[in-house]
Curated annotation (Swiss-Prot):
PANTHER family for this protein: METHYLTETRAHYDROFOLATE:HOMOCYSTEINE METHYLTRANSFERASE RELATED (PTHR21091), UROPORPHYRINOGEN DECARBOXYLASE (PTHR21091:SF169)
The protein's role, per its UniProt record: Catalyzes the sequential decarboxylation of the four acetate side chains of uroporphyrinogen to form coproporphyrinogen and participates in the fifth step in the heme biosynthetic pathway. Isomer I or isomer III of uroporphyrinogen may serve as substrate, but only coproporphyrinogen III can ultimately be converted to heme. In vitro also decarboxylates pentacarboxylate porphyrinogen I.
Complexes and interactors: Homodimer.
Chain residues that bind coproporphyrinogen I: 37, 39, 41, 50, 86, 164, 219, 339
Subcellular location: Cytoplasm, Cytosol
Protein name: Uroporphyrinogen decarboxylase
Encoding gene, per UniProt annotation: UROD
Family label: Belongs to the uroporphyrinogen decarboxylase family.
The organism of origin for this protein: Ovis aries
Length: 367
């Protein structure tokens, strides 16, 4: 079904739809697997490609993004590709300056400090037209993949994007962003609405360009407790999925599965399972069997091996994967890590993880 439906531009036919079938809740012969940050600095070829230009110049080069997206697939039999890009291209498209400082991470020289700073932001309706380079990268990559596996598009969720725009970069406390929530709730909602209005056409545009699934990253969910999350994050997470689905229908595009990954958002698992996403991503702090009890059979779960488990021996990785697969069960499940791969990880161990998922999930189905 899916392979034919999501070929808006006569792309090559999909040969491996295991990831999409699992996302839709259909039965699969084995458990599909991909890794967050699978296109990353742990690969020497990634570091080599990236050395040619600065980070955001790389993001703006469809050819470079395509090459980086395909690199892990040349090494490992992954069941999905995720486009190489960054969640901060959206604040950039809204007119904010963002630089990537080597060894430090993203930096906003002029973060949002006052309510009136919101006036500096561009009209969110123009954002998708500013991000044509992402759409070009997706189309090129989808063609180059030649139907090998599906291509995932992504974006950051409104609260997570807001934290960067207010904090001016990464933060261990998010105290400036949370100060906004407590001191300027109206302005906070205004900013979150602007971001939602920017994200919807951006995500619809990714599907129009060839993305076959979408993941929304609420990476900073854990900085909010249940109350703040249900007030300032969840309504926008819901709104994104509802409006993207409506936007796809309006554009005459087939529906694609959507994944919500709210890191450290275990306190809102039930709500996330009912937020309009086909897949809920889990970090490693959540016990799989407990998560399954809490969300029921209505959604697919994705995750959630501790990325640091890949520092273990290949034999130990196999045992940990086996345990994880037993805990999640064979169906309505996509294997992944509970967060992205770290730069100092051994590619051989990433391969061991992928192979172990395929091997043990097949054995699990035989028994």
């Amino acid at each position: 079904m899916e392979a034919k439906e999501s070929r808006p531009q006569g792309f090559p036919e999909l040969k491996n739809d295991t990831f999409l079938r699992a996302a839709w809740g259909e039965e699969t012969d084995y458990t599909p697997v991909w890794c967050m940050r699978q296109a990353g600095r742990y690969l020497p070829e990634f570091r080599e490609t990236r050395a040619a230009q600065d980070f955001f110049s790389t993001c703006r080069s469809p050819e470079a993004c395509c090459e980086l997206t395909l690199q892990p697939l040349r090494r490992f039999p992954l069941d999905a590709a995720i486009i190489f890009s960054d969640i901060l291209v959206v604040p950039q498209a809204l007119g904010m300056e963002v630089t990537m400082v080597p060894g430090k991470g993203p930096s906003f020289p002029e973060p949002l400090r006052e309510e009136r700073d919101l006036e500096r932001l561009r009209d969110p309706a123009t954002v998708a037209s500013e991000l044509g380079y992402v759409f070009q990268a997706i189309t090129l990559t989808r063609q180059q993949l030649a139907g090998r596996v599906p291509l995932i598009g992504f974006a950051g969720a409104p609260w997570t994007l807001m934290t960067y725009m207010v904090e001016g970069g990464g933060s261990s406390t998010m105290s400036q962003a949370k100060r906004w929530l407590y001191q300027r709730p109206q302005a906070s909602h205004q900013l979150l609405r602007i971001l939602t209005d920017a994200l919807v056409p951006y995500l619809v545009g990714q599907v129009a360009a060839g993305a076959q699934a979408l993941q929304l990253f609420e990476s900073h969910a854990g900085h909010l407790g249940p109350q703040l999350f249900s007030k300032f994050a969840l309504p926008y997470i819901r709104d994104v999925s509802k409006r993207v689905k409506a936007g796809l229908q309006e554009a005459g595009l087939a529906p694609v599965p959507m994944i919500i990954f709210a890191k450290d958002g275990h306190f809102a698992l039930e709500e996330l399972a009912q937020a309009g996403y086909e897949v809920v991503g889990l970090d490693w702090t959540v016990a799989p069997e407990k998560a399954r009890e809490r969300v029921g059979k209505t959604v697919t779960l994705q995750g959630n091996l501790d990325p640091c488990a890949l520092y273990a021996s290949e034999e130990e990785i196999g045992k940990l994967v086996q345990q994880m697969l037993n805990d999640f069960g064979p169906q309505r499940y996509i294997a992944n890590l509970g967060h992205g791969l770290y730069p100092d990880m051994d590619p051989e161990h990433v391969g061991a993880f992928v192979d172990a998922v395929h091997k043990h999930s097949r054995l699990l189905r035989q028994n």
